[in-house]
Amino acid sequence: MSTDPKINDLHRELLEEGLKMRRAVLGHEYVDRAWNNATPFTRPGQQLITEYAWGNVWQRPGLDRKQRSLLTIGIIIAQKAWLELALHTRGAINNGVSELEIREAVLHSTVYCGTPAGVEAMMVTEKTINEMIERGEYKRPEETGL
């Protein structure tokens, strides 16, 4: 941290706001586990992600949380970061993104990221949604036909 109290106050504020947003999107359980399992080596990374991504970028005007989730899904598919895709699929559902919209984001990403990435992404997103249903975290709307 800085020796300037104003900078430290700013970091604290961004961290608090970031934790609120991160919990709203990813859930308390995940955030608590990530935060509590951070080591002295990884804690600065958790702080950076929470302050910058969640306390700043996810709070900006211009895109709502649903739009940010769809963008994030496409970007993660391009990176082939499958654990993150599962996490952000949960977040997308929490942000009101429908299964149909998630599926379409995966199909759209398949065209630009390649078939292997798209096939894996389809499996990861479907598995995640089904796990959420099994745990009672999500109820599939009847009219979706999925």
Curated annotation (Swiss-Prot):
<dbReference type="Pfam" id="PF02627">
    <property type="entry name" value="CMD"/>
</dbReference>
<comment type="similarity">
    <text>Belongs to the carboxymuconolactone decarboxylase family.</text>
</comment>
<keyword id="KW-0456">Lyase</keyword>
<dbReference type="InterPro" id="IPR003779">
    <property type="entry name" value="CMD-like"/>
</dbReference>
<dbReference type="InterPro" id="IPR052512">
    <property type="entry name" value="4CMD/NDH-1_regulator"/>
</dbReference>
<protein>
    <recommendedName>
        <fullName>Nitrosuccinic acid decarboxylase npaB</fullName>
        <ecNumber>4.1.1.-</ecNumber>
    </recommendedName>
</protein>
<comment type="pathway">
    <text>Mycotoxin biosynthesis.</text>
</comment>
<keyword id="KW-0210">Decarboxylase</keyword>
<dbReference type="GO" id="GO:0051920">
    <property type="term" value="F:peroxiredoxin activity"/>
</dbReference>
<dbReference type="GO" id="GO:0016831">
    <property type="term" value="F:carboxy-lyase activity"/>
</dbReference>
<comment type="function">
    <text>Nitrosuccinic acid decarboxylase; part of the gene cluster that mediates the biosynthesis of the deadly neurotoxic nitroalkane 3-nitropropanoic acid (3-NPA) that acts as an antimetabolite of succinate and irreversibly inhibits succinate dehydrogenase and disrupts mitochondrial oxidative phosphorylation. NpaB facilitates decarboxylation of nitrosuccinic acid produced by the nitrosuccinic acid synthase npaA to yield the final product of the cluster, the lethal mycotoxin 3-NPA.</text>
</comment>
<dbReference type="InterPro" id="IPR029032">
    <property type="entry name" value="AhpD-like"/>
</dbReference>
